UniProtKB/Swiss-Prot annotation:
Its cofactor is Mg(2+). This is tRNA dimethylallyltransferase. Its EC number is 2.5.1.75. The gene is miaA. The keyword Magnesium applies. Substrate binds at T13, A14, V15, G16, K17, T18. GO terms for biological process: tRNA modification. Keywords: ATP-binding, Magnesium, Nucleotide-binding, Transferase, tRNA processing. The record marks T102, R125 as: Interaction with substrate tRNA. The keyword ATP-binding applies.
């Protein structure tokens, strides 16, 4: 059985992945799979910068709006569902294109991730259960920053599991999870979009301003009123920062500035993950040659396969 070619577009938030993916899909007869851990959730639209039907421009998209925020969508589930989507697109005679910024999820598709077969240490786990989730996440960040960049602070169960695996095996959870041999069913081309840090941060600030103009506060308030504030999906950047505002503990401007700050930090962690964990062909974003360079690399890859 021949390998399935897959184009993968990665990079930090607000760098321009979505628009590039649409252009490549048009020119290469592709369909797009979202590689974003947040865009799978219905109702989380503005805060996740979810692509709109207009922006899709007729290109079929997968793994967007497939579940409710109260229903966890894990990396293991993403691996299974994305592989199904790849097969569906390939069997239809089209090119699968994955686009997103969730490194752990995307990497799990192409490498045979082990999602935790190490045995448990119930005594150690019980000790960790007594600690505050912030303290636990800080422990993880100190011991294994790569895992901390991918596991949300509010996902206490996952943080504890990562610490438990390190306690039992003596090596970082991020190293334990991944098998560095590519799954032989796929032949991926990883294209990464990079941008000058100052320009990227300015884009992020502008994107957050636009989110507020488009109704982010209303979207977050709806989630708040549905008592979903402790659901991991809703604790993502863009929502959790507004909850103190709803409770009268911060101003709206403070909430906006915090979203911008957290988004910038997240972009930095994304870049660290992609540069350290994946073999990526980087392209300069935000210049006139971005699209043509990406298209040339993709065409060369597809011709040579």
């Amino acid at each position: 059985m021949s390998k399935i070619p897959v184009i993968v577009i990665v990079g930090p938030t607000a760098v321009g992945k979505t628009s590039l993916s649409i252009e490549l899909a048009k020119k290469l007869d592709g369909e797009i799979i979202s590689g974003d851990s947040m865009q799978v959730y219905r109702g989380l639209d503005i805060g996740t910068a979810k692509i709109t039907p207009e922006e899709m421009d007729g290109i079929k998209h997968y793994l967007i709006d497939v579940t409710n925020p109260s229903e966890p969508f894990t990396a293991a589930k993403f691996q299974i569902e994305t592989r199904k989507c790849i097969e569906t697109i390939h069997q239809a005679g089209r090119l699968p294109i994955i686009v997103g910024g969730t490194g752990l999820y995307i990497q799990s598709v192409f490498y045979d991730y082990d999602f935790g077969n190490v045995s448990e240490d119930k005594a150690y786990r019980a000790e960790l259960e007594q600690l505050d989730k912030t303290v636990l996440w800080q422990m993880l960040e100190q011991k294994d920053p790569e895992s901390a960049a991918q596991i949300h602070e509010n996902n206490k169960r996952r943080v504890i599991r990562a610490l438990e695996v390190m306690h039992l095996t003596g090596k970082p959870f991020s190293e334990y999870q991944v098998n560095n041999v590519l799954n032989d069913r796929y032949q991926p081309l990883f294209l990464g979009l990079d941008l000058d840090r100052a320009l990227l941060y300015e884009r992020i600030n502008q994107r957050v301003n636009l989110m507020f103009e488009e109704g982010l506060v209303t979207e977050a308030k709806k989630l708040y009123e549905q008592h979903l504030v402790d659901v991991p999906a809703v604790r993502g950047i863009g929502y959790k920062e507004l909850f103190p505002y709803f409770e009268g503990k911060s101003s709206l401007e403070e909430a906006k500035e915090l979203i911008q700050k957290n988004s910038r930090h997240f972009a930095k962690r994304q870049l660290t993950w992609f540069r350290n964990r994946m073999d990526i062909d980087w392209i300069q974003a935000g210049v006139s040659s971005t699209e043509s360079e990406a298209l040339n690399k993709a065409t060369t890859f597809l011709t040579a396969k």
